[in-house]
């Protein structure tokens, strides 16, 4: 049985050995000396220099102690373990033969560091069944458990932690937990999650700031200190802690928020105007000293006076418009120091605003003392500001607390308190704090049973709040991001599939057929961001239907292209556009070119990409003439279901940008007859794994990447794992101008030392070679080298892609690891591979494992077996409802209990 990681509510007190112990003891010491009460802040602590001197002396002593490395207790190889080693290991790893430079016989004689390193290697190889090699006799399950137990005992005897066991809690090592054991039903242990304080996500942080300052958040330029790893997969885990960079950012944030709360006019708010004023004043001073009669001086002085007046009026207006909450205003407007009751009212109000609760006695006492001392030193307003900042700077602002404050059960687990549960449910589904009904349930202590949890989970799934921008990295000055009513669900699949990372892969616009350089509006960067929005739309609509979700995501051949999902609006606008174009064609015959340009330049911009902000030169005249003479068209023009108004100076183009993104689906936008009813079938496609965004995200800058694509399938869908690449390995694929990428990759990885890992990736990734690195379907591979150039296309215009000599593609691959012999075997191409994957129980269960990690914020343990089995059954019994999976997970013991 796997030993679960025990995490106390205060993990910083769990000391280890060596330098790690020094650091842990130091931080414990710092916490005790600098934060004796939760209400104290770093600002209070750093004022006492004597404490820092004491800390420095203690650190010197601790470092000296750490430098002393006493001889550790010998690691004994027990007779039972020695027998297992003799059966399976000594032939290659003894005093005579040391493959991989490993001598197990010498283990007891090694110094502590070398011994720990070897124990970690043994544990990892045995745990992952990588040793003995697959072609050798394997130890039984009992023998493996015997070896692993001995390794754990050896670490304990040395007073050390297993590095391998520690990294099992990192996101990239989640699949190391035995999949078959998780779903076999043999594990009967009652599920739980470790007691924890979990850093909030950047999305929760944004909503938290909005709840405090409302719409002023953007104006205040609050910086978000929360960052998630930029990887494909679940990213928000509970094993991160706040550091110095978090504190520095929050210090600036707290200052800005407190200024806003008290209507203090911050210099930052008028920084631009003040800078302009200073520059103008400097210029006037220079002129006055060098040439007092300069003709520009009067106008400069007039401009300065006008600017100073504007700044003064703006500050006055800001003061008048500012709304200070009553408990704060009582103190800031009082000519004398406030009384204790007034101070307590301000403290209670700030806690209610920031934490939606009352301070505990210790917090109240600490804040009251701080407020009294601060007001005595710097006055009412600035003293109050210090207290407001202190509350904002408490650890609770950045952490979600899930310690399990409920009663303990017979299994040693503690249920989340109703308040803890209200936040856990709200954060999981809405990325914001509890709504009114959850708050009420927490106040009444009505979040204690599965039924009570289920009631609120189902309610929030059925009636989500307003639309939320799913990713603030995707929008640019020219593009908008996708907004959804179900952020948590969409975010999970975005992270799971990783298609939203496509915009990070730089592509050459010339290779992106159809790109033009005019205003860069048809660049690949613009196109792929719009494609990400359409992939979001596809996933969002499948989630809304909530039927056979996993299979639909993997196998649907219906996609969105140049669409926002509103079919009714699309039909109306298409009919209107037809009538408009016919009118434009008629007016073109009657109007003079300049009159026509002034009348229809916005429509020409929106529909034909003729720049409405440019001048009407000869090129524009020729383009208008060509377009108007082509009406009526034999095809449907591309439209985007969004209305435009002639009253705006610059069109809000949204989807009207980058019409040439259609070519990623092998559709020529110059000849395509637009489909208003979407999603619609696109040939040679099957699900998200054939969407151009996923294919681009899992490619290189100038080529496909079978390794990356195959690794994703192995890890995300087949619950497999690929060991880390040794640092000494050169992973670059050698150039050969007369071979396909597959041939070159095979030559590079066919050696036994490489193939033992690449056999789990390459055969899966090869199947996707039917798509290029832009996601375009292909049957041949172009050899994009100068000596193979056939036609060189212009750098600008409707077609910019060069034509090269090609070679036939081999898209066959091999599927292994589904656990189903009927599905494993040779595959024809990506479509064949995906079709088989979608039928696999292991694939379904693997997606559920990742959903568990997303909603629990951690990797699964063997003790979570019953939770995962229940979620899998919920999906099957509900006809493939992802909502059913979520309800199952958020009402499970893994979610409700802590230990």
Model-predicted regions and their roles:
Residues 1-54:
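N-terminal secretory signal peptides that target proteins for export/translocation
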Residues 57-67:
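Bacterial N-terminal signal peptides
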Residues 71-146, 677-830, 834-838, 844, ...:
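Sequence context surrounding c-type heme c attachment/ligation sites in exported
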Residues 72-286, 290, 302, 309-326, ...:
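Aromatic- and Gly/Pro-enriched helix-to-coil junctions and flexible linker segments
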Residues 79, 83, 138-142, 337-345, ...:
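Soluble non-cytosolic domains of exported or imported proteins
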Residues 94-104, 134, 159-164, 361-363, ...:
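Short, solvent-exposed loop/turn and secondary-structure capping segments
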Residues 135, 330-337, 349-357, 371-378, ...:
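Second-shell loop/turn segments in exported
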Residues 150, 162-164, 170-316, 337, ...:
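Extended surface/linker regions that mediate inter-domain or inter-protein docking
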């Amino acid at each position: 049985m796997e030993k679960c990681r025990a995490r106390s509510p205060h993990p910083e007190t769990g000391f280890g050995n060596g330098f790690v112990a020094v650091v842990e003891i130091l931080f414990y010491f710092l916490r005790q000396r600098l934060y004796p009460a939760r209400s104290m802040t770093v600002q209070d602590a750093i004022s006492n220099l004597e404490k820092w001197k004491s800390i420095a002396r203690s650190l010197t002593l601790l470092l000296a102690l750490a430098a002393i490395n006493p001889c550790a207790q010998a690691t004994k190889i027990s007779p039972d373990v020695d027998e297992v080693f003799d059966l399976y290991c000594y032939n290659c790893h003894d005093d005579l033969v040391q493959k991989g430079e490993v001598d197990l016989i010498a283990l007891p004689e090694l110094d502590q560091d070398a011994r720990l390193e070897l124990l970690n290697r043994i544990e990892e190889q045995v745990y992952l069944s990588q040793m003995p090699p697959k072609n050798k006799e394997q130890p039984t399950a009992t023998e493996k458990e015997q070896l692993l137990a001995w390794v754990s005992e050896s670490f304990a005897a040395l007073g050390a932690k297993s590095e391998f066991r520690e990294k099992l809690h990192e996101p990239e090592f989640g699949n190391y937990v035995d999949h078959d054991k998780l779903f076999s039903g043999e594990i009967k242990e009652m599920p739980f999650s470790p007691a924890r304080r979990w850093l909030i996500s950047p999305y929760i942080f944004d909503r938290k700031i909005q709840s405090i300052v409302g719409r002023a958040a953007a104006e205040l330029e609050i910086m978000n200190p929360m960052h998630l790893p930029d990887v494909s997969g679940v990213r928000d885990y509970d094993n991160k802690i706040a550091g110095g960079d978090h504190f520095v950012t929050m210090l600036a944030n707290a200052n800005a928020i407190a200024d806003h709360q008290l209507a203090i006019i911050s210099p930052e708010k008028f920084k631009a105007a003040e800078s302009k004023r200073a520059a103008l004043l400097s210029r006037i001073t220079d002129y006055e000293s060098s040439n007092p009669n300069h003709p520009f001086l009067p106008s400069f002085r007039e401009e300065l006076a006008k600017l100073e007046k504007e700044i003064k009026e703006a500050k006055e207006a800001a003061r008048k418009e500012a709304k200070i909450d009553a408990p704060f205003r009582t103190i800031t407007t009082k000519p004398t120091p406030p009384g204790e009751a007034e101070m307590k009212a301000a403290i209670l109000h700030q806690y209610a605003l920031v934490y939606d609760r009352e301070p505990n006695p210790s917090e109240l006492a600490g804040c009251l003392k701080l407020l009294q001392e601060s007001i005595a030193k710097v006055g009412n307003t600035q003293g109050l500001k210090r207290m407001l900042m202190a509350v904002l700077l408490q650890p609770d602002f950045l952490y979600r607390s899930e310690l399990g404050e409920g009663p303990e059960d017979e299994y040693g687990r503690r249920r989340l308190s109703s308040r803890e549960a209200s936040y856990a449910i709200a954060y999981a589904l809405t990325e914001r704090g509890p709504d009114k009904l959850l708050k009420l349930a927490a106040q009444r202590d009505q979040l204690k049973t599965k039924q009570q949890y289920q009631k609120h989970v189902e309610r929030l799934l059925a009636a989500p709040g307003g639309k939320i921008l799913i990713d603030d990295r995707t929008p640019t000055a020219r593009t908008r991001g996708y907004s959804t009513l179900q952020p948590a669900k969409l975010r999970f699949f975005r992270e799971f599939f990783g298609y939203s990372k496509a915009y990070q892969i730089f592509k050459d616009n010339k290779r992106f057929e159809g790109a033009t350089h005019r205003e860069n509006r048809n660049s690949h960067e613009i196109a792929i961001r719009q494609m990400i929005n359409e992939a979001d739309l596809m996933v969002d609509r499948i989630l809304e239907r909530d039927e056979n979700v996993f299979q639909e995501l993997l196998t649907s051949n219906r996609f969105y292209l140049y669409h926002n999902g509103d079919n009714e609006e699309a039909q109306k606008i298409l009919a209107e556009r037809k009538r408009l174009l016919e009118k434009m064609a008629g007016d073109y015959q009657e109007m003079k070119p300049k009159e026509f340009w002034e009348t229809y330049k916005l429509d020409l911009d929106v529909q034909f990409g003729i720049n409405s902000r440019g001048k009407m030169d000869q090129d524009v005249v020729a383009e208008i003439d060509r377009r108007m003479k082509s009406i009526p068209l034999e095809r449907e023009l591309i439209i985007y279901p969004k209305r435009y108004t002639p009253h705006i100076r610059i069109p809000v183009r949204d989807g009207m940008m980058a019409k040439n993104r259609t070519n990623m689906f092998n559709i020529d936008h110059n000849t395509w007859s637009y489909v208003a009813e979407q999603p619609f079938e696109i040939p040679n496609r099957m699900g998200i794994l054939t969407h151009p965004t996923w294919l681009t995200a899992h490619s290189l800058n100038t080529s496909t990447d079978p390794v990356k694509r195959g690794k994703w399938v192995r890890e995300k869908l087949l619950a497999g794992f690929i060991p880390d690449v040794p640092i000494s390995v050169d992973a670059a694929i050698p150039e050969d101008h007369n071979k396909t990428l597959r041939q070159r990759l095979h030559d590079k990885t066919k050696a036994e030392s490489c193939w033992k890992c690449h056999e789990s990736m390459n055969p899966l990734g090869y199947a996707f070679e039917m798509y290029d690195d832009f996601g375009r379907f292909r049957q041949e591979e172009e050899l994009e080298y100068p000596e193979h150039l056939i036609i060189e296309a212009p750098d600008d215009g409707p077609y910019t892609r060069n034509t090269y000599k090609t070679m036939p593609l081999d898209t066959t691959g091999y599927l292994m690891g589904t656990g189903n012999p009927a599905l494993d075997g040779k595959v024809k191409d990506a479509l064949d591979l995906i079709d088989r994957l979608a039928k696999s129980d292991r694939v379904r269960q693997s997606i559920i494992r990742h959903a568990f990690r997303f909603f629990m914020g951690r990797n699964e343990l063997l003790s979570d077996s019953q939770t995962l089995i229940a979620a899998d059954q919920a999906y099957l019994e509900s006809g493939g409802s992802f909502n059913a999976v979520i309800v199952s997970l958020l009402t499970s013991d893994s979610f409700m209990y802590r230990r």
